[in-house]
């Protein structure tokens, strides 16, 4: 997924917004969905503020704004709850790309923050089906263990990048202080 994937569409839609007086909800829907995918949350918020009052009742625009609010608050549970919606064809592609991107980020965060997590907790947070979760975990080389009747998922242990030695850091600091004194 490349962030420039929708750059031409965004440029066209932004020009349309600047040039035309009255736009339909479709333009705002597409622009809002792409801003969310590109992680331009401030732009999405400002766009929502520019949406005319008569269009703010559009269900899809409201749903996209709820996604924006969830992303701004880093609330994955709300994000995954609000993204479960029957999206129109014009916003389906960027919303699906956004969903995949957010799931990747969620798994990356979970993998770095936890040594293990109960499967039901991750299912509840990501709102994935059990099969989807199993495929995602298998793709990331996560392992499963049983704790009675509950499944524990264990992320693949990531090796920490080699830390610089204290001597190297001390030498660098000494050189810097010497430079400042001269």
Swiss-Prot record:
It is found in: Cytoplasm; Nucleus. The keyword Cytoplasm applies. Keywords: Cytoplasm, Developmental protein, Differentiation, Nucleus, Oogenesis, Signalosome. GO terms for biological process: compound eye morphogenesis; COP9 signalosome assembly; defense response to bacterium; imaginal disc-derived wing morphogenesis; oogenesis; photoreceptor cell development; protein deneddylation; protein stabilization. Residues 1-167 form the PCI domain. One of its GO terms (cellular component) is COP9 signalosome. The keyword Cytoplasm applies. Essential component of the CSN complex, probably composed of CSN1b, alien/CSN2, CSN3, CSN4, CSN5, CSN6, CSN7 and CSN8. The PCI domain is necessary and sufficient for interactions with other CSN subunits of the complex. Probable component of the COP9 signalosome complex (CSN), a complex involved in various cellular and developmental processes. The CSN complex is an essential regulator of the ubiquitin (Ubl) conjugation pathway by mediating the deneddylation of the cullin subunits of the SCF-type E3 ligase complexes, leading to decrease the Ubl ligase activity of SCF. The CSN complex plays an essential role in oogenesis and embryogenesis and is required for proper photoreceptor R cell differentiation and promote lamina glial cell migration or axon targeting. Belongs to the CSN8 family. This is COP9 signalosome complex subunit 8.
């Amino acid at each position: 997924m490349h962030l420039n994937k929708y750059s031409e569409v965004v440029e066209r839609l932004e020009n349309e917004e600047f040039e035309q007086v009255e736009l339909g909800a479709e333009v705002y829907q597409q622009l809002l969905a792409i801003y969310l995918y590109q992680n331009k949350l401030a732009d999405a918020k400002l766009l929502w503020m520019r949406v005319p009052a008569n269009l703010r009742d559009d269900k899809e625009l409201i749903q996209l704004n709820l996604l924006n609010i969830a992303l701004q608050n880093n609330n994955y549970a709300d994000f995954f709850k609000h993204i479960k919606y029957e999206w129109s064809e014009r916003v389906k592609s960027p919303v699906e790309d956004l969903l995949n991107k957010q799931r990747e980020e969620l798994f990356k965060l979970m993998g770095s923050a936890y040594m293990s997590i109960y499967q039901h907790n991750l299912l509840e947070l990501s709102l994935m089906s059990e099969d989807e979760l199993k495929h995602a975990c298998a793709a990331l080389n996560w392992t499963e263990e049983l704790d009675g009747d509950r499944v524990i998922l264990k992320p693949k242990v990531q090796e920490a990048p080699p830390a610089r030695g204290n001597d190297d850091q001390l030498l660098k600091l000494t050189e810097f202080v010497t430079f400042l004194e001269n």
